Amino acid sequence: MSSAYLASLACPRCQRDYPESAAFTICPACVDEGQNVNPAPVYDLSRLGPGWQPDRGQPGVFAYRDLLPIAATTVPVSLHEGSTPLVPAPALAERLGLGELLIKDESRNPTWSYKDRLAAVGVTKAREAGADTVVVSSTGNHGAAVAAYAAAAGMRCVVLT
């Protein structure tokens, strides 16, 4: 089971809808046509309501757990990613003719990359599925992030470069 607000998975290429519990990561209809396309989540955000707030009692990106494809009973793998600061950049704002410019400082994440957000959810989902190993293809930040989160989860990690 996943997010209460996840309605389905939809293929952006062929527009087919699949149940959110589908046990595949590539659209079967497109694979039959020689195309590898990942279905994207379709959320029913109308069910959130105007008073919805992130759950600040959850670590990192899991404050937004209601919107993530993670079962309510799954313990998240988090290194307290996210909640990175916005840093004012007045000189650059002036040079660009902007009244104000804020730059998100993602180097404050555990592996110094915004990829930590994806790694936290991906490794949590892998553990939820019963995996003991995660495998990724990366030449940099994504591999480092997944390796860190896999280690935190007690899982093996293979990074293909």
Question: Positions of the model-derived regions?
Answer:
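PLP-dependent amino-acid enzyme catalytic core
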Residues: M1-T161
